[in-house]
């Protein structure tokens, strides 16, 4: 069964986020992120964009402090594609270009979500961000699997 909390409101798959993976999978990854951001390991936690709360990650512009989430909440919207400014939004375009560098097409993802193909999309993303060696979930930005240490091959 897929976890719908991992449907990012901008079209990003939250299951590939380093914060989410550290919180769910790896105490050592959680500790290294905590050290980097001068936090306690307990503060490195997130259940995905659909489940943000006061205990969620909030360092910088991520998680509960995400400007996209705040914008959508202020407009009473769930996803970027619902906004009348979606096609011309500078914030979205900037984020989409960053995501494109790791092989993520936010517009394609949002099109699948809009078409009601959320579960199909979540299954595809889960498979895409899984280590080919140990079959465990990994993060977008890791070069090696945090489970088995295998160099990750990405389908971009």
Predicted region positions:
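Ferredoxin-like iron-sulfur electron-transfer modules
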Residues: 119-137
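Short cysteine-rich clusters marking metal-coordination/redox-active sites
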Residues: 46, 80, 131-134, 145-148
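Active-site beta->alpha loop and helix N-cap motifs at the rims of alpha/beta catalytic domains
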Residues: 135-138, 152-154
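Hydrophobic scaffolds flanking metal-cofactor catalytic centers in soluble metalloenzymes
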Residues: 1-81, 85-114
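Short Cys/His-rich micro-motifs in 6-15 aa windows
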Residues: 88, 149-156
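Broad hydrophobic/π-residue packing in well-ordered secondary structure
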Residues: 86, 118-124, 144
């Amino acid at each position: 069964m897929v976890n719908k909390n991992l449907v990012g409101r901008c079209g990003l798959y939250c299951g590939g986020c380093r914060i989410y993976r550290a919180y769910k999978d790896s105490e050592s990854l959680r500790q290294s992120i905590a050290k980097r951001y001068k936090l306690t390991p307990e503060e490195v936690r997130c259940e995905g964009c659909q489940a943000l709360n006061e205990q969620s990650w909030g360092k910088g512009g991520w998680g509960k402090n995400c400007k996209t989430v705040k914008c959508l909440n202020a407009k009473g919207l769930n996803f970027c594609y619902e906004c009348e400014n979606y096609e011309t939004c500078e914030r979205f375009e900037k984020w989409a270009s960053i995501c494109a560098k790791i092989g993520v097409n936010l517009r394609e993802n949002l099109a699948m979500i809009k078409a009601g193909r959320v579960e199909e999309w979540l299954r595809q993303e889960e498979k895409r961000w899984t280590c080919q060696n140990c079959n465990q979930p990994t993060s977008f930005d890791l070069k090696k699997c945090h489970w088995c240490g295998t160099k990750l091959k990405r389908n971009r």
